[in-house]
């Protein structure tokens, strides 16, 4: 709620600490509007406060990586305005490539076309989905869970090729729903590619939250990737 944001912001404002608030994409939640309203209310009383509210245009695990990039810049001692500028610059690089257990949750939530939803339910296909710039896009299908995970890896490869990604340039993690053992198996499938192309030896695994699980169902699995904020090469 607006009051939740006011309560979170005020101690920092009173201490003279500038704030960067990174909100889930507006396509999935009204939290950014609440944060913006709270900021405007506070600025009426504290006009010198520095509060920047950013629409992450991403969510779940990838939003977490984005916040960690902001923390990285803070810990490196970047100046506030430069931090905000850099965070806005890397935002467009964020992608989530994932698959889900079945298409019904996306269909009922209005996140995917009804025709594809009916076909998907009838054929028991596993949809492949990309999230970018606050929207989800159908990116293909597979006939089994294992093949759908392999295709997620192929989507990641294509993205890395398109971006001419260099080792150390991107932050990366796996996101999953309820099945942690499957997430560990997926990590094994990914480890050679991620080590070679991204220079990452230990792949982090994170469970997605309920806000996104409502749309994906209990068994999404995929990857999140975003450019490192301190990458200057």
Positions of the model-derived regions?
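Short acidic/histidine-rich motifs immediately flanking catalytic phosphotransfer sites
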Residues: 15-18
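Glycine-rich oxoanion-binding loops at beta->alpha junctions
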Residues: 1-12
């Amino acid at each position: 709620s607006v009051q939740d944001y006011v309560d979170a912001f005020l101690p920092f404002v009173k201490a003279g600490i500038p704030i960067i608030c990174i909100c889930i994409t507006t396509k999935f939640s009204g939290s950014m509007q609440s944060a913006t309203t709270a900021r405007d209310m506070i600025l009426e009383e504290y006009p010198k406060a520095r509060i920047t509210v950013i629409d992450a245009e991403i969510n779940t695990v990838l939003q977490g990586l984005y916040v960690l990039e902001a923390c990285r810049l803070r810990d490196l001692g970047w100046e506030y305005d430069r931090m905000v500028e850099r965070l806005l610059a890397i935002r467009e690089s964020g992608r989530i490539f994932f698959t889900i257990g079945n298409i019904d949750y996306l269909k009922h939530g209005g996140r995917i076309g009804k025709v594809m939803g009916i076909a998907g339910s009838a054929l028991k296909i596993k949809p492949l989905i990309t999230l970018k710039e606050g929207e989800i896009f159908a990116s293909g299908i597979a006939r089994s869970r294992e093949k759908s995970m392999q295709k997620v890896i192929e989507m990641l490869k294509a993205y890395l090729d398109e971006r001419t990604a260099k080792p150390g340039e991107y932050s990366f993690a796996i996101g999953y729903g309820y099945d942690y053992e499957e997430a560990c198996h997926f990590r094994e499938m990914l480890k050679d590619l991620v080590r070679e192309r991204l220079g990452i030896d230990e792949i982090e695994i994170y469970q997605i939250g309920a806000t996104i699980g409502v749309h994906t169902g209990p068994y999404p699995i995929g990857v999140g990737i975003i450019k490192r904020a301190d990458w200057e090469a």
